[in-house]
């Protein structure tokens, strides 16, 4: 049977994750992005090797600077390659900040993380979607790996080893089940990362982003890679998750839930949209608050609809080879 236009390739991971292990989820996102960039020919060697070489070169050059050696002995990194690495480092810091805020402020984790490859955000060649589902689903027993340990968010040695083993298991499965399209080389493209999540206080958050972006515009030449707070993220004011695509856009979904992806997403010829997560949350709220009156439930529904947003990271990555 011929594959339908924009029919996604779905790699099923089931309930392999526990969304209370925030460090694992964060590291998984970063490793998946690294894997996609290398597999899709956006860099000529694995990302970890690239970052290691970059670090060694910088250390070597710093030694020359500190000892006043001849600058001719310093190793020069090609501009595009240097920009690629610096963008990666900046992006990973931004991702780290998102998940740190989830832990520090007890926010829900992103429901969707998407990796977008194209000549621009409006001309996408390939879309990769990591679907994690709502944290409420996990709290209500849909994740078999969940437990009642109140210390799940702690980073003890045992948990560190378990997370590392789980990450290795996921990456091995991904290598084995990678789609055939990965065997076809892709030319260097621009990579953007978007996430869809619930924001607890959307008004304050948007005001902070607006003010920080204004400050950034006034200080464009003073960009610092270590500045990884909210000013490095660009909000897209759109409640529904939608990606504009082409008929030729290739879609791959990594499903980290037991849900049927087609029950969660609408895959159309020109767009990908996420079906209402807030309805699921409302259903859970109604079950847990049976004594609430209809007005309260209506207010909860409105709040859920307003608080779910998706946004695009400020940092984009231009592929090199």
Swiss-Prot record:
Signal peptide: none annotated. GO terms for biological process: regulation of exit from mitosis. GO terms for cellular component: nucleus. InterPro entries: MAD1/Cdc20-bound-Mad2-bd, MAD2L1BP_domain_sf. Gene3D superfamilies: 3.30.900.20. Disulfide bonds: none annotated. It comes from the Eukaryota. Residues 286-306 have a biased composition (Low complexity). Coiled coil: none annotated. Residues 280-306 are annotated as: Disordered. This is Putative uncharacterized protein DDB_G0286405. The lineage of its organism: Eukaryota, Amoebozoa, Evosea, Eumycetozoa, Dictyostelia.
């Amino acid at each position: 049977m011929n594959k339908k236009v924009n029919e996604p390739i779905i790699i099923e991971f089931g309930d392999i994750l526990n969304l209370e292990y925030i460090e694992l989820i964060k590291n998984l996102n970063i490793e998946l992005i690294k894997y996609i960039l290398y597999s899709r020919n956006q860099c000529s060697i694995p990302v970890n090797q690239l970052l290691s070489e970059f670090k060694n070169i910088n250390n070597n050059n710093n030694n020359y600077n500190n000892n006043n050696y001849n600058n001719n002995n310093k190793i020069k990194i090609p501009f595009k390659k240097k920009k690629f690495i610096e963008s990666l480092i900046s992006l990973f810091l931004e991702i780290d900040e998102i998940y740190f805020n989830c832990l520090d402020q007890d926010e829900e984790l992103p429901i969707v993380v998407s990796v977008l490859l194209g000549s621009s955000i409006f001309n996408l060649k390939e879309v990769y979607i990591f679907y994690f589902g709502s944290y409420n689903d996990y709290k209500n027993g849909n994740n078999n790996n969940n437990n009642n340990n109140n210390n799940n968010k702690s980073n003890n040695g045992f948990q560190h080893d378990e997370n590392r083993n789980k990450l290795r298991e996921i990456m091995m499965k991904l290598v084995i089940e990678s789609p055939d399209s990965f065997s076809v080389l892709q030319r260097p493209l621009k990579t953007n990362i978007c996430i869809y999540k619930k924001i607890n206080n959307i008004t304050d958050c948007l005001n902070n982003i607006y003010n920080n972006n204004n400050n950034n515009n006034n200080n464009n030449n003073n960009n610092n890679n270590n500045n990884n707070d909210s000013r490095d993220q660009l909000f897209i004011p759109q409640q529904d998750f939608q990606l504009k695509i082409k008929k030729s856009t290739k879609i791959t979904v990594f499903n980290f839930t037991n849900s049927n992806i087609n029950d969660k997403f609408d895959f159309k010829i020109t767009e990908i949209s996420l079906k209402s997560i807030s309805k699921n949350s409302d259903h859970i709220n109604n079950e847990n608050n049976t004594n609430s009156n209809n007005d309260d439930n209506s207010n909860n529904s409105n709040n859920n609809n307003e608080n779910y947003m998706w946004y695009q990271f400020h940092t984009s990555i231009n592929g090199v080879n």
